[in-house]
Amino acid sequence: MRRGFYIGRFQPYHMGHHLVLEQISREVDEIIVGIGTAQISHTVTDPFTAGERIAMIYGALRELGRWFYIIPLPDINRNAVWVSHVKSMTPPFEVVYSNNPLVVELFMEAGMEVRRPPMYRREVYSGTVIRRLMIEGGDWRQLVPDAVAKVIDEIKGVERLRNISKKDFA
Amino acid sequence: MRRGFYIGRFQPYHMGHHLVLEQISREVDEIIVGIGTAQISHTVTDPFTAGERIAMIYGALRELGRWFYIIPLPDINRNAVWVSHVKSMTPPFEVVYSNNPLVVELFMEAGMEVRRPPMYRREVYSGTVIRRLMIEGGDWRQLVPDAVAKVIDEIKGVERLRNISKKDFA
Amino acid sequence: MRRGFYIGRFQPYHMGHHLVLEQISREVDEIIVGIGTAQISHTVTDPFTAGERIAMIYGALRELGRWFYIIPLPDINRNAVWVSHVKSMTPPFEVVYSNNPLVVELFMEAGMEVRRPPMYRREVYSGTVIRRLMIEGGDWRQLVPDAVAKVIDEIKGVERLRNISKKDFA
Amino acid sequence: MRRGFYIGRFQPYHMGHHLVLEQISREVDEIIVGIGTAQISHTVTDPFTAGERIAMIYGALRELGRWFYIIPLPDINRNAVWVSHVKSMTPPFEVVYSNNPLVVELFMEAGMEVRRPPMYRREVYSGTVIRRLMIEGGDWRQLVPDAVAKVIDEIKGVERLRNISKKDFA
Amino acid sequence: MRRGFYIGRFQPYHMGHHLVLEQISREVDEIIVGIGTAQISHTVTDPFTAGERIAMIYGALRELGRWFYIIPLPDINRNAVWVSHVKSMTPPFEVVYSNNPLVVELFMEAGMEVRRPPMYRREVYSGTVIRRLMIEGGDWRQLVPDAVAKVIDEIKGVERLRNISKKDFA
Amino acid sequence: MRRGFYIGRFQPYHMGHHLVLEQISREVDEIIVGIGTAQISHTVTDPFTAGERIAMIYGALRELGRWFYIIPLPDINRNAVWVSHVKSMTPPFEVVYSNNPLVVELFMEAGMEVRRPPMYRREVYSGTVIRRLMIEGGDWRQLVPDAVAKVIDEIKGVERLRNISKKDFA
């Protein structure tokens, strides 16, 4: 049995993440999805809570009919203990999937196998692009799985993001 | 759609928990299992990491063929914000299942519906009893689902518990 | 102008505290009341939130027609920086009133003047006694100022304390 | 009885805040003034400690002859629990006064009534403007209540701000 | 080059520690002394600050004419990341010396070599015994190196310990 | 006996620091070197752990044949208690050496003597310059003591810094 670990902030979970997970699911038996910066929400770059992100990812993955672990990971703000932190919050895994240079370096220093997943249509499958479309009224729905759009609608996520991105005159 | 929330420390997950979850699963559509005191491990009362507890519960629930959310919840050490903390880390839920007086009080003050699940064979389906059996070499395996015993064996959990429960002469 | 500093947990604020503050108010121009362990609530020894304790003390002192500073002080869990912590959260003061050995030692080491206030009817003007009376249905109202009893009633404080002091069978 | 909650960083408290509080005091019975980011001081944007800010505001409000609650609120760095955090540190309140988009959003999501107070002479009644005048030797005194200027002088606040705004050649 | 790691709370550093370090110094080239629970002081079980403990140990070891690393280690309160925490605060080391069951278990799980140092006159070379002698006026000086007694006298350590061990009547 | 306190982040320790310490060592009997921001590593501005920085400084100072205290100081993120924090982690000292405006201000407000050490060849004896040379493949070795270069090589510090400074396309 072989488990892979994939981490992201998922603000929100989009088709780029989804295509990577489909790819990874062909290489390992089980996938652990770590939700990074889990403690932050209601900011312009991190609008959604960990619970909301779990609901998004869970909905998208359930459609695939596969078992996944979806685990919120609060920041620990000490890179030197971060790998231990992740390991203590997850079932054992053998391979890490990441393109983030810091994540790659930390797991490599810890002696783990790290693979770089392919990146799909990076110019639109991007949290930054999607959040900007949400604020400006563009078409973000086509960039995320349907189950994700459904969650964002239920929590009034676009309204929240627009409100908190207003200028503060205080 | 109706979700129920059930929280415990699960040190370890045992048949008492399992029977409650089977009961709850007949009352709601989806169950969120919160792993309390997620940040603590390697102590006599809390020997297992959150990741190890996730593996135990996941194994036991997968055998049931049902979807569950299993979410580690680190202590926040401020009861007055604890309900908000839980809500931010979980998908929305409508009913709480707990017999813990503090959990009941906090969710009641927050205006949530709280139900008391039945408790099964409390004299043996008990984390305290099971950990003592582990230390003393008793038969703890019959008190937990098979998938849980398998995880505890893989991580050498009994050996760990015995080691850390030795007297400190320092 | 001369300010005095008086600290307590005030779980709840009672006539013993009140008599001390009346005494202190004859010695200094302004009194700063520090609410210790401000972050804790909903426990058997610390049932009330900082906000609830502020409301209690404020009500009791307003009846006296005097100006007071009432300042919540979260624990910092590092005694060596605690005096700096207190000073950073309060207007400047010249004298400390306390009978707590640790508070006395920390302010003495910091070179501050410390006075021991008289203690009144210690066998009943005591948070421990009052909380026990609340749980057991005894007459706690005569031991606190009227304004305090009013706040405790409004927040259903006795019911909360009784609920959280129930035995946990989980 | 109706209480209003007004929050700011008050670095320093100025006439813009003061005019808002005068306005609010006509709408509610009691005002709770929350001092945000209470734990930070000695920086270019947040030069004053919570205790110093309490002294400033207290002095200004006492001149009005009204009762106010002035409560330091340390950051909790988790927006999703911030409203609970505020509520646990304050007496109960019914209406929030704020123009800060995040504060507005968080209290709105919590189902509270939020009002936008008028803003007065925003181009000069501004902490940023006042701190710049302090550094550059301009006339900041006319922009704050007399009691505030007195506190700033006593703590040598302008000297502190100038010192810490020097370039670091280290 | 081979480094050994030895950890204790050193409240205070006594002849038992000293004899162990002399023993260890014959087995490795360099010794790293970790001061555990570095953030705590002014309590009955942990009266001395990390800085005071560094001064004690430094004085005792300098008399030996050997190079040592003396490193304060604040508690991190998460056993699962503790080894990473220690490693990030220390130069690389190859062998751990400890009789503490938890320390032994954590380093063993991390795959490190752990040795049990001999324990000398455990009935008197004991922090608990020495602190009790300090409180009761017994002869503690013969149980610590001279340099340690000198530091304790300079900081008035015995007076502090007696003061904070008084009963709290508050 | 007179001790001086010198603080820096030492990312990495370089000849500028070394020349200052040589200068200070002529003015005081013992030097305490505080390693600031000790908890941070593996970032572009703070690549090295506290333990790695201790090894660097220790190696450089041992060549001088002098006794030094080298003490990691985690950030406390509350300037108003920072001086107390430093004092609790260090042996007593009488004079502070710093050119950092905030450090100077905080120790001055605490009534300590502060001296400004001379700065040597600031245009190259600079952590920023040295880290940029490391990334770009320039000659950084001549700017640090030999013992420091040796440690950086052993931990593959340049490779780490280059890896984590790559652009994140995630």
UniProtKB/Swiss-Prot annotation, chains A, B, C, D, E, F:
Q: Does Nucleotidyltransferase appear among the keywords?
A: yes
Q: Which GO terms describe its molecular function?
A: ATP binding; nicotinamide-nucleotide adenylyltransferase activity
Give a single Pfam family match: CTP_transf_like
Keyword annotations from UniProtKB, A to Z: ATP-binding, Cytoplasm, NAD, Nucleotide-binding, Nucleotidyltransferase, Pyridine nucleotide biosynthesis, Transferase
Which EC numbers characterise this protein's activity in its record? Answer: 2.7.7.1
Q: Which compartment or compartments is the protein found in? A: Cytoplasm
Record's Gene Ontology CC terms?
Answer: cytoplasm
User: What's an example Gene Ontology biological process for this entry?
Assistant: NAD biosynthetic process
Q: Which NCBIfam families match?
A: arch_NMN_Atrans (TIGR01527), cyt_tran_rel (TIGR00125), PRK01153.1 (NF002243)
What name appears for this protein in its UniProt entry? Nicotinamide-nucleotide adenylyltransferase
Q: What organism does the record attribute this protein to?
A: Methanothrix thermoacetophila (strain DSM 6194 / JCM 14653 / NBRC 101360 / PT)
